Amino acid sequence: MEEAKTNRKYKSSVFTLLFGEKDNLLELYNAIENTNYGSDTDIWITTLEDALFMEQINDISFVIEGKFVVMIEHQSSMNPNMPLRMLLYIARVYEKIVSEDNLYGSKKITIPNPEFIVLYNGDDECPDKQVLRLSDMFSEPLPESLAKLELVVTVYNINKGRNEEFATRSEKLKGYEIFIYLIKEYVKSMDRGSAIKRAIGDCIRQDVLRDFLKEHGSEVHNMLLSGWNWDDAKRVWQKEAREDGREERLNEILDLMKKGYTSADIENHFRKQTRSASV
């Protein structure tokens, strides 16, 4: 089985950049599950990638010792549809793991046990631990014992001060929590770019993710400043739709996203359109 490695050709997030490395990933998993896998543990990274748009489809997935396949998603907004998303992800991961020849053979094959984890650090209220079930999404709810298909996702709140035992077991996770917390605090009194820059500098001076931020500081800054997600797109689209009632702008916004436009770039784009139309 191949060694863990990060494919830097594909767009990622600060979270996946930090925890995509084998040692950091094992530290994170050990912190969450209170296990003690060492650096000699056999890890195979199975994160899904979109070759067309050169970006990752899911955040992190990996196989431990050939026994467990773990999928970890990091989110800043709650998504009740995660069980279905995880189902689609795990099906593709199993396709990577299992040979098609074996799949149609007469001998039973074995597959790693799946585990599904979401780490949440958004601003909405969220309990320390929450369980999401695929069966809760069925149009006709059934008793748990009658569900023919089930998938369970465990959501952990990793905001500063929540699930603190995780941070005590992982310096990297503790540092990540502090870093994000500082950005949230600084952005209250300054623009986002300045807040990110200040948080990076303060963390380096205070020995919080020091080596990581010294090596990847500019990359982290750019990721956080221009890192778009679907929630950002939806917020901008809703704002534009309220202003002029033309929901067809959604497609234009999504096209601009694919070209790497930031939220500020897109808002400026539409302002210029409005000014041109009024001349």
What name fits each language-model region?
Residues 172-173:
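Solvent-exposed, non-transmembrane segments of extracytoplasmic/periplasmic domains
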Residues 1-166:
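Accessory alpha/beta interaction modules
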Residues 29, 176-179:
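Short, Φ-rich (hydrophobic/aromatic) sequence segments
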